[in-house]
């Protein structure tokens, strides 16, 4: 199995069924987003929401994984990123199924009457600190424009009773996010702790919350095996997307 991930051209990534340019986005497409887009439960969903769409990566991954009848709304605050997401989506096989909205999610959600079976977000998680190179990158990295309580409240306002709200976060921040979500009435239903290899502690966590109570399923995902090739589990999760798997 090849170790190459995706062909690099024009400041983006070529996946098996679509290309993502991200040179105008503050936060680039990377492993976190790919993990989340491949992992989020999509069985039976009819409508999806991507909060903080960036380059459109998550919306495109969900489109690839779902039936042609599933509609996806992708909301992005930063205008250049939203424009690039729209371009990426227009060049994909699913342009008619994904709607990009250049908007503040906290305002956009108040105007919606539909509810979503799946809400997905690769959210900012840094507190205000070291100054970023651009205001756009600061907006993407820091919780100043969308803090975690606001994100959880926003998702709660537009999710179906049996829907899932899925995020990817650094391990320790994910633990705090989980405590906050539980205190706000969410129920943790799925958790996958992600480690680079068996010898390392998990550095990322994938979380799926629901308004509906139920059993929580937890597991661990190791990205690379002892030979430094991608593990069987990581390959099984992502091979529908990576070009050379």
UniProtKB/Swiss-Prot annotation:
Catalysed reactions, as listed in the record: adenosine(37) in tRNA1(Val) + S-adenosyl-L-methionine = N(6)-methyladenosine(37) in tRNA1(Val) + S-adenosyl-L-homocysteine + H(+)
Provide the protein's localization.
Cytoplasm
By sequence similarity, the record places it as follows: Belongs to the methyltransferase superfamily. tRNA (adenine-N(6)-)-methyltransferase family.
- The gene that this protein is the product of is yfiC
Tell me the protein's name. tRNA1(Val) (adenine(37)-N6)-methyltransferase
Keyword Methyltransferase on this protein?
Answer: yes
Q: Does the keyword tRNA processing apply?
A: yes
Q: Which GO terms describe its molecular function?
A: nucleic acid binding; tRNA (adenine-N6)-methyltransferase activity
Which InterPro entries does the entry mention? Answer: DNA_methylase_N6_adenine_CS, SAM-dependent_MTases_sf, Small_mtfrase_dom, tRNA_Adenine-N(6)_MTase, tRNA_adenine-N6_MeTrfase
Question: What keyword terms does UniProt attach to this protein?
Answer: Cytoplasm, Methyltransferase, S-adenosyl-L-methionine, Transferase, tRNA processing
Matching PROSITE patterns, A to Z?
Answer: N6_MTASE
Question: Which species is this record about?
Answer: Escherichia coli O6:K15:H31 (strain 536 / UPEC)
Q: What is its EC number?
A: 2.1.1.223
One cellular component term (GO) for this entry is: cytoplasm
């Amino acid at each position: 199995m090849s170790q190459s991930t995706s062909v690099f051209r024009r400041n983006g990534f070529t996946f098996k069924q679509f290309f993502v340019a991200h040179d105008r986005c503050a936060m680039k497409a990377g492993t976190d987003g790919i993990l989340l887009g491949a992992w989020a439960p999509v069985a039976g969903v009819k409508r999806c929401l991507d909060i903080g769409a960036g380059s459109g990566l998550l919306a495109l991954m969900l489109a690839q994984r779902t039936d042609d009848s599933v509609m996806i709304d992708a909301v992005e605050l930063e205008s250049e990123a939203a424009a690039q997401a729209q371009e990426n989506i227009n060049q994909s096989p699913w342009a008619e199924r994904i709607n990009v909205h250049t908007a503040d999610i906290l305002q956009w959600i108040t105007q919606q009457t539909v509810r979503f079976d799946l809400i997905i977000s690769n959210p900012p998680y840094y507190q205000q600190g070291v100054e970023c190179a651009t205001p756009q990158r600061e907006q993407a990295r820091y919780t100043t424009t969308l803090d975690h309580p606001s994100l959880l409240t926003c998702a709660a306002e537009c999710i179906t009773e049996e829907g899932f709200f899925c995020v990817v976060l650094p391990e320790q921040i994910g633990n705090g996010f989980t405590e906050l979500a539980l205190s706000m009435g969410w129920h943790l239903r799925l958790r996958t702790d992600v480690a680079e290899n068996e010898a390392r502690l998990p550095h990322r966590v994938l979380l799926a919350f629901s308004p509906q109570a139920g059993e929580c399923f937890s597991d661990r995902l190791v990205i690379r095996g002892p030979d430094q090739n991608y593990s069987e589990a990581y390959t099984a999760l992502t091979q529908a997307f990576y070009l050379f798997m």
